[in-house]
Amino acid sequence: MARYDALELQVIDENGYEYIRAHEGVSIDDELLRFLRRTHTYELGWVKVEGDKYVRYDRIASVAIKRGLDDESGPGPSR
């Protein structure tokens, strides 16, 4: 069972969380820096999360690093 780290986003007016996996060859800490600085793939007003969903930056209430997520079950329900 593959485990991975991701950024966990809490979106305003939504139950649960959205997740962003670190890009290939990038640590989750560096991915968080890219997200906070809005560089690389985070330069636009929309952020791609797992699946084919996009979230607007101005709708994100918080971001945190979530470690050890399970590849088979995914992030799971709201925590």
Label each region the model flagged.
Residues 2-32:
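N-terminal acidic leader/helix
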Residues 6, 33-36, 58-62:
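Short small/polar-residue motifs
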Residues 11, 32, 36-40, 69, ...:
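Generic low-complexity, intrinsically disordered sequence content enriched
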Residues 42-79:
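Short, mixed-charge low-complexity intrinsically disordered segments
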Residues 2, 15-17, 40, 52-55:
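Intrinsically disordered, low-complexity segments enriched in small/polar residues
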Residues 22, 26-45, 49:
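Acidic, low-complexity, intrinsically disordered interaction modules
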